């Protein structure tokens, strides 16, 4: 998801270009998660300090359900707005100082703006902490560990056993 922005950096502040987001390559979020983007576009605005990238992307990611621990495909939709600062002055080729904040991404020495890290961070921030495959997911049986979505479980939970909130039950009576 790389875009050559050399020409845009030469244009005046306020100039805009719109690009489709490359959906041919999956985006690796971490060691286990990969996003398959199906559509997206980014608007690149020339600003005084570099380029402001604003865009939207849609796709799918395979997650693990927090109740039944089964993998499922979840749709994702992300909106992002990130600032990119050049590392090389486009007219002279002189190196520029790095951005003063850690939130600004850097355009490489060949004037290539790479959206991958910005997309990765925004997608990860939008994923649920405990994804659920379906609102009706019954989860795993706490006694035998069986998936209650596949077959009903006949196990009887220990009513008097290890219940950390059992003392609160007496307050309800």
Label for each model-derived stretch:
Residues 1-173:
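Structured interface patches
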């Amino acid at each position: 998801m790389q875009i050559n922005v050399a020409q845009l950096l030469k244009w005046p502040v306020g100039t805009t270009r719109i690009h489709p987001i490359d959906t041919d390559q999956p985006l690796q979020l971490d060691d286990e998660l990969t996003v398959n983007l199906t559509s997206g576009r980014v608007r690149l605005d020339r600003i005084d300090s570099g380029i402001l990238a604003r865009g939207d992307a849609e796709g799918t990611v395979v997650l693990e359900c927090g109740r039944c621990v089964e993998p499922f495909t979840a749709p994702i939709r992300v909106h992002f707005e990130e600032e990119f600062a050049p590392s090389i002055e486009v007219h002279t080729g002189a190196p520029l100082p790095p951005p003063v904040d850690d939130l600004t991404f850097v355009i490489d020495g060949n004037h290539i703006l790479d959206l991958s890290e910005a997309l990765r961070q925004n997608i990860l921030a939008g994923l649920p902490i405990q994804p659920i495959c379906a609102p009706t997911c019954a989860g795993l049986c706490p006694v035998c560990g069986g998936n209650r979505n596949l077959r009903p479980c006949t196990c009887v939970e220990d009513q008097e056993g290890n219940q950390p909130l059992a003392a609160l039950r007496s307050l309800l009576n």
